[in-house]
């Protein structure tokens, strides 16, 4: 898919910081009050808006339908705009520029479901997770030979070349070894469309991918594919800010936690991700907690 040109979406707040009282703002359409650090307020006032970066070729989190950006992250962004009294501008750009752009200070926030890794945590701070990004597998619905993770022993598996599904192979090998199983042949693909086609054509027995993408695929084609177990240790996805921007990080965590407590986060997960995560951490993870690099 061609990455769309950059454009801006403006928040609907009519007056910048109009409802601020001693650094505490009252959301016009929400009963929650958000305490905003004065340093952060001055930064936003100086520029006049908060600038977030997203992509739009990452379904179900961010994608385009008839030229309109939609998805899980966009739904959360709409909620964020409703409870913040300052303007929020969104710039859409290719994935490769999002995290470096935030790290360099070009953007305030990477509002995209980025996988939390130790390497990224060296130059970014992550919010509390918004979804799980663990690796699972799918198989053909009619393949009765695979009923559990142990049944992957000796099976031919499809993964994306250079992707996190390939990086999860050591985790799977360790799990199989614990169950006295062994890893079978691994086939690498440039993209998952080819891997899924080979699964249908019985050239591979299962395909490994992040659990959200697989859940969406199985929801779309329940008569063809079946979701299996996680093959990696748990991993998470979150938004990211520049390293050391604790004021913005605290504000975003407050917002996300409020969405979790009022049930909105779960509702949006069910709608867009076709799976809900009941036990996501409520605090940002520390370096070393992420298993997939």
Q: What does each model-identified segment do?
A:
Residues 90-100, 186-197:
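Short helix-initiation/N-cap motifs at beta->coil->alpha
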Residues 1-19, 23-25:
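N-terminal secretory signal peptides and thylakoid transit peptides that target proteins
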Residues 56, 131-139, 211, 215-257, ...:
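Periplasmic-binding protein-like
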Residues 77-84, 165-188, 218-220:
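Ligand-binding cleft/hinge of the Venus flytrap
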């Amino acid at each position: 898919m061609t990455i769309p040109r950059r454009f801006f979406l403006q928040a609907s707040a009519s007056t910048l910081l109009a409802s601020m009282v001693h650094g505490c703002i009252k959301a016009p359409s929400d009963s929650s009050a958000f305490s905003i650090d004065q340093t952060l307020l001055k930064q936003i006032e100086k520029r006049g808006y908060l600038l977030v970066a997203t992509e739009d070729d990452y379904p179900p989190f961010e994608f385009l339908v008839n030229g309109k950006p939609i998805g899980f992250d966009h739904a959360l962004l709409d909620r964020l705009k409703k409870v913040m009294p300052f303007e929020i501008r969104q710039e859409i750009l290719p994935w490769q520029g999002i995290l470096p752009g935030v790290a360099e200070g070009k953007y305030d926030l990477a509002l995209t479901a980025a996988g939390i890794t130790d390497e990224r945590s060296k130059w970014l701070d992550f919010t509390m997770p918004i979804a799980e990004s663990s690796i699972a597998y799918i198989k053909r619905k009619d393949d009765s030979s695979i009923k559990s993770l142990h049944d992957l022993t000796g099976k031919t598996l499809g993964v994306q070349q250079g992707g996190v599904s390939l990086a999860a192979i050591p985790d799977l090998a360790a799990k199989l070894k614990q169950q006295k199983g062994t890893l079978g042949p691994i086939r690498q693909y440039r993209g998952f469309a080819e891997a899924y086609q080979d699964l249908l054509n019985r050239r591979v027995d299962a395909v490994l991918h992040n659990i959200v993408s697989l859940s969406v695929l199985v929801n779309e084609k329940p008569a063809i594919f079946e979701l299996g177990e996680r093959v990696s240790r748990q991993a998470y996805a979150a938004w990211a800010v520049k390293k050391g921007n604790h004021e913005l990080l605290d504000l975003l965590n407050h917002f996300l936690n409020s969405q979790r407590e009022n049930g909105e986060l779960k509702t949006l997960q069910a709608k867009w991700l076709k799976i809900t995560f009941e036990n996501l951490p409520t605090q940002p993870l520390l370096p070393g907690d992420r298993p997939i690099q």
